Amino acid sequence: MTGVCGCCGALRPRYKRLVDNIFPEDPEDGLVKANMEKLTFYALSAPEKLDRIGAYLSERLSRDVARHRYGYVCIAMEALDQLLMACHCQSINLFVESFLKMVRKLLEADKPNLQILGTNSFVKFANIEEDTPSYHRSYDFFVSRFSEMCHSGYEDPDIRTKIRMAGIKGLQGVVRKTVNDELQANIWDPQHMDKIVPSLLFNLQSGEGTESRSPSPLQASEKEKESPAELTERCFRELLGRAAYGNIKNAVTPVLMHLDNHSLWEGKTFAVRCFKIIMYSIQSQHSHLVIQQLLGHLDANSKSSATVRAGIVEVLLEVAAIAASGSVGPTVLEVFNTLLRHLRLSVDYELTGSYDCTNIGTKIIKEHEERQLQEAVIRTIGSFANTLPTYQRSEVMLFIMGKVPIPGLHPTLPSIGSGPEGNRMIQVMLLKSLRQVTCGFQTTNMLTALPNSFLDPMLSFALLEDAEIRLLVLEILVSLIDRHDNLPKFSNISIISDISVLKLKVDKCSRQDNLFMKKHAQHLYRHIYLCSKEQSSVQPHFEKLYSLLALISMELANEEVVVDLIRVALALQDLALSSEEMLPVYNRCAIHALSSAYLNLISQLTTVPAFCQHVHEVIEMRQKEIPYLLPEDVFIENPKIPKTLEKLEGDVLFQQAKITEVLGGSGYNTERLATPYVPQFTDEDRLSKRKSIGETISLQVEVDSRNSPEKEERTPAEEITFETLKNAIVDSVGVEEQEKERRRQVVEKFQKAPFEEIAAHCGARATMLQSKLNQIFEITIRPPPSPSGTITSSYGQTQSRSVPVYEMKFPDLCVY
C-alpha cells in the first residue's frame, strides 16, 4: 500500500511533499525559497516530524550522490542548514542524527567539493549551543576524517589548500562541540589528541615556508584569511585555551612525539614556536605542568644526540622566560636538579666519547655539540632563576653549591670514567651555572642571602690553583655584591682623575651590611690578598679583583671597612715589593697597578684632600719615571713592562705612615691604619689546597689541641687598661708569626717524623685524656654524706663510713 501511495503525489505524507517541493526542476535555479519557508514553518509547528524530515532528506541526498547529481546535493545541504538554524534547541536532537549521517556521506565522497561542503555544514552545526545533552552521539569518525583531510596530498595546490583548511575548520568544530560537554566522548583522550594535535602541527609547519617568502602587503591582506598556518594557529590556541589542569599532559605529549618523529628538535625554531603558542595559550597557573613535561622528556632523551637535547633545553629556556614568576611549580629544586644532572651527563659523554660506558663507540659524539648543549643548559638555569623570588634564588644558589665537588668539604661526585678532569669540568660548569643564577641578584640583607654554608665553600675556590675556577669565583662574588649596577663602571682598571663622571650610585651602609662585614670581612680581605699573589693570575683576574675592592667600598663600607681596605691595598704593594715571593715581573707590575688604581678610587671616595693629594703625587711620579706600575701600561694587549724590576723606594711608593697621618686628622683610626695588614691562614686554606695526608693529620691535631680540657681552664680576670690594648695591637704581628711557625713545625713533624714517634705522641695524649676522665668520675660519683662522719686512712685520705641506723646517736629531743 505504501508503494502505491508513493506513486501518487496527493497521497504522499505532507512532510515528503514539502521536502520534494524545495527542489527545482533545474538544479542551477537553486533552492525554491518560498517552498523552503513552508517546510521550515511546518518543522517548527510539528517538531515531532523533524526526524522524519531529516531521514527523508538524507535518503534523497544519498541517492543524488550516487547518481552524481551534485546540484541537488548542494540544495539538500542548504535546506538542512536552514532547518538546523531554525530549529529550537530542545528539538534539535531529533534532527541531528540524520544531519550527521548526511555530513558523513559527503566526507566519504571522493570529490573535494563535496568534502568541503560537508565540512562547512558541520562547522555551522558546531557553532549551535545545545541545551539538551546527547548520550549516544559519537564524533570519532569526524576526528579521523578531518585529521586525514589536514594531511591531504591532492595534486592541485589550490584544491589541496582548501581541503586542508576544511580539515582544520572541521577539527575546530569538533573541539568546540565536545570540549565542554562532559556527556560526550572525552576529546582529551590520547586516542583523539594523537590525531588532532599532529594534524595541526603538520599544517603549522607547512606554513613556515610560505610565510618566509614575504609577500607584498596587498597579497598578504588578500590571503591572510586563507592561510592554513594562520587558521591552524588560531585553532591550536583555542584548543589549548580550553584545556583544564588535568588535560594539559594529553595535549602536550603529542607535541613532543611529533617533534621527535620528525626530528624537529635540532632546528629549534619550530619547536620554540610551538611551545610559545602553548605557553601563551594555556592558563598561567598551568605553566609548570608544561615545564615538568619538558624536563621528563629531556630525561627520556638522555642518550639522544647532543643536538636533540640542546633543542629541548633551548625550548625550556624560552618557556622559562614566559612562565610567570613563581609558577615553576612546587618542586623548584627538582627543576635545577634535572638540569644539573644533564650537565653532568654531558661532561661524561664529552670525556668518555660514549653514551654508554659498556658500548664504547656505539655513537659518534661531537665535542663541540656537547659544549653547545652545556652552554644551553647553563643559560636555561639562569633563565629559570630569573623567574624566582629572592629567597628561592638563595636556595637555588645553596643547592648548586652543594653539588660542586670541593676537596675536603664536598666529596667528589662519582664519575663514569672521566677521572679528575671530569671533576674539574663539573666544577667549572656548576660555577658557570652559579654565575648565571647570581646575575641580577639583589638582596637587602646580605647576611641571610649569603650564609656560611654558601660563602665558605665559595671562598675556598678562590684559593685553588686553577685560574679559570678562580676567575669564575671572583665574577660570582662581584655579581652578588653589586646591588646598584655599578659593576660596568669598574670593568676596566684605570686611573680616574675625577670619579664624579662615573655617576656612581651610593647608599648608606645598612645595619645588616655592617653585620655581614663584621662577620666575613677578614675572609674577603684574605682571599683578595691570596688571589693576587697567585702566579697564574692574568689581566681578567686583576680586573675582577679591582671590581671586587671597588664594589665593597661602594656597597658595604663603613669607616672601619675603609681603613681595612686601605691596609689591604698597601699590603698588596708590599707583596709586589717582597723578595720572598717568587712572582713574575708581570704579576708584580699588575699588583702595583691594581693597588694604585684602587687607592686612587678610595682616596676620592673618602674625600680627604690630603689623602687625595698624596695618592695623586705618587701617581704623577710613576707616570714620569716608572709608568709600567700603572694600569694604562700593564692592562693592555701588549703590556709595556721591563724584563726585570729594579728595587723601588721613595716617592714612587704609597707611604703607610703618610696615609695614616693624613687620615688620622680626619678622625680615622690611626692605630689600625699604622698596623700592616697580614692575612690570617686558617684551616680553609688547607682544605682548598690540601695535597698530602700530613696536612690532614696536622689539621686534626690542631683541632684536638684547641678543644683539650687544658685550654678550657678558667684564668683569673685580668685588668684591661689602655696600655694593655695598645701592647696587644703592637704584639699581634709577632703572635701571628709565632702561630705560623708553630703550624709549620706541626706539618713538618707529621711529614718527616717516624711512625713510632707519632704513635707515642698520640698514646701520651690518650693517657692524659684517661687520667682527666678518672678525675672527673671521682668527683662526680661520690656517696652521699653520712651522719656518722668520716674516717681517716693511713695515707691521710678521708673515706666515708656507712653506719647502721641502730648505731647512730641522735639528740635526746629526737628520740620518742
From Swiss-Prot:
Post-translational modification: Palmitoylated at its N-terminus, anchoring the protein to the plasma membrane.
Topology class, membrane: Lipid-anchor
Compartments it resides in: Cell membrane
Region (Disordered): 206-230
GO cellular component entries: plasma membrane
Compositionally biased intervals (Polar residues): 206-219
Keyword tags: Cell membrane, Lipoprotein, Membrane, Palmitate
Gene3D superfamilies: Leucine-rich Repeat Variant
Domain of life of the organism encoding this protein: Eukaryota
Keyword Disulfide bond: no
Purpose of the protein: Component of a complex required to localize phosphatidylinositol 4-kinase (PI4K) to the plasma membrane. The complex acts as a regulator of phosphatidylinositol 4-phosphate (PtdIns(4)P) synthesis. In the complex, efr3b probably acts as the membrane-anchoring component.
Family assignment from sequence similarity: Belongs to the EFR3 family.
Cited PANTHER family: PROTEIN EFR3 HOMOLOG B, PROTEIN EFR3 HOMOLOG CMP44E
Full protein name: Protein EFR3 homolog B
Native species: Danio rerio (Zebrafish)
